[in-house]
């Protein structure tokens, strides 16, 4: 029997909100029976999980950035299918991407917390790192599945899902071939080469700031006012897909920190004793303690005042989100309890594209995972039953409640604020553990491993919603994605644990030539005073929480705004640039059909920029790992390199707009 022919482009209503009574029909409709899970797709997925886990762990610990693995894996899956002459690979490619993308999320969860064990001089064995990552990943999967339908189906068109959009365009274009695949390939080549030249050779800088001008340097030093802009093609593409509305809200958060809070606090240089300031903020970073006056640089004021306010805002926005989504949470829990008790057994079977793992099975896996985590804590970390029960309750409650927050953040900006949420987890867990008699070395180890489990769970929840949205747009079977995600999680956790042990022995995380591991260093700095009676910036956390309440009351999305406060300005400002390009190209004509064609073409080019940048990020990581150093550090640190970067960025924007405006209505 000849397989049913599958369409090779996304439907017109893929990215917009549906009209009343309108249904979304995916690329592979529910009536079709596409190949999804095959020996080829599973093997390729596992290989991708191993390779990208190792690469992401190294790059993340080296520079603190974990590249998103979903896009480069999708490109490789499409490319391999083409090389091997395989046809109708869409379903299999989604499975490859879903298994392989476990790498980036598990890595993010592990490297943000667990290296802090080594930084604090607490040795961690392979099994501790592995089990912490594995259990966190499993919790993230099972806690997200009940919310899949809400985020990917009921909220269709309401969230931009930037990373899922880019990955879906890659997969669809690969299946279609022809002009769309060529356009994506050209955009990927342009974006990839642009970012590769910056990252590997340093011919121009990746970011520019107002410090390159004399007046800008004066403004930074005297008034603590600095404006920064990341010039990478990938972030420009991300801004296009996010759109102008959310980009402006995110950047407004950055503007509040950099143009109001930092200058105001910076103006107190003469009035405030720097040593007292360090004590008040709980700053323990060696270089600042050695030179207290350096706390008043714009960058340090952002790190120690702006970021904590952002963390408080993220936490409160999360709590507000939990309250607002309490109805969905109650429905998911009610469905689980009802099905577990056999109440839904007679219900009609859902169509193929809406079939999840049964609630009974999800609850079984959840209970088994929680029991395993309890055993891990009780026999591997803690002594008493009270401490073990307390630890498991912290993990479950925070992971359960913040799962929706992580998914929400990914749906809006494609960036999961796990480090901010994990800092709050560490603070809360440390306070609770101290109250049940745990402190010092044992307390720090326990809090960090608890943080590792929660961080990985939230990272997985955010990353997995991307996979499920891709599956929804394309028409894969959710149950198959969910089931095989467990395998990807196991493989990624084992790889990350092995790589982290090797990197600790090869480079270390403290001392000369050590890996930077910035997030883990931040975790170590936060947890040490909590467990040893030091100072914690509670007032800043409360300020952020109060700000989130005010923003919510006036109708401004608090999570997006708080994310802007936490994420550096230079990464947020280019989102507005990308959003402005989207607004410009999609409103130039009076012909709505032409505007839509231009916007769609721009989405494809932006996806190419993101994909090319992500793929070249992997190449750069591999080159760094094998010791290839082509970076012109002397030139790259000069003002001339920054001016060159600004000029090249303007050329890139011009190319993006020109190439997008070439769209024809029929396209």
What function would you assign to each model-found segment?
Residues 1-667:
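Alpha-helical multipass membrane-protein architecture
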